[in-house]
Amino acid sequence: MLGVLLVLIWSGSGSALGQINPDESSEETPSNPTEEIPASESEPEEPVSPSEKEPKRRVFKRIGPQPMTPEQREEAERLRKVAAKYGTDPTAIVGRVQLTSQYLDLTPHANATLSTVRVDLPFRSDYLLRMDVPFLRTTDAQNPGMGSQRGLSDFAVTAAWRAYNTPEYALLIGAVSTFPTASEPALGFGKYTVGPAIATARFLPRLESFLIGLLQYQTSVGGDPSRKDVSFFSVTAQVNSFWAQRWWTIVQSVWHVDFERSGKSSMVMEFEGGRNLIGRFGAYIRPGVGIYGRDVTGAYIWNIEVGVRYMFTSF
């Protein structure tokens, strides 16, 4: 059941590590017509197509922060405020009280239900403290002697700092720690874990959406020596869009690598649809499906999550 525990850990305090400015177009130096050219070099060279000239430079132009018009910057700032109000921007420094419940179909014989209370406390507009209190129930039909186990899982704390913030691009850096507070051995790692987390959000003017990246590494640093060590890396890529007056959607893929299992990996795809109900109250539903690697950490056959949240401003 260790795969279930990955959903307890915040997968991004906040995915590019810095801002890449668009490259200026280079001017080619014209050849001197009076310069003598040896006969062996007099054959004209084949022209280089624009698509082959500077492919790497064009890639960086597309993935890095782009220059925007004043109207686009104004729209980016407006949508950043909307995303913060709805609780969908992982780089926003806003308060949160959130309740979620998730059902995971892990294998043909095992499933789990995870309920989490999350509280975010913002400080001085650039700092955030997050606390997650999870409750887990697991069932494994192939191990009837264990039966169904339920209770408190591992408590998680995240401390984060927003290192960069503009209307079109933001970067959050944090550290995530978990503590072996599980009421039953099967409900937690049995280890203290710690690791860095990074979150970025970039405005996409053409889509009027945000491209969000989350990266996290987690490793065990102590705890029960008889329990298996923890060492995994996760990457999340998502597109956050807004519709009509109060609706939002998120399409995301999550890739996990478990280094304690020789680097085996898994991937899931999830879709979230949510609505702002009234004021700063919102609700969402998020189904997901496993793509590959169902027998490794962080994987499932399918899942569905529902949640409600209340967002509040910084202190």
What are these regions (language model features)?
Residues 20-315:
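Transmembrane beta-barrel domains of Gram-negative outer membranes and organellar outer membranes
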Residues 13-18:
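Sec/Tat signal peptide C-region and signal peptidase I cleavage site
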Residues 2-12:
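Bacterial N-terminal signal peptides
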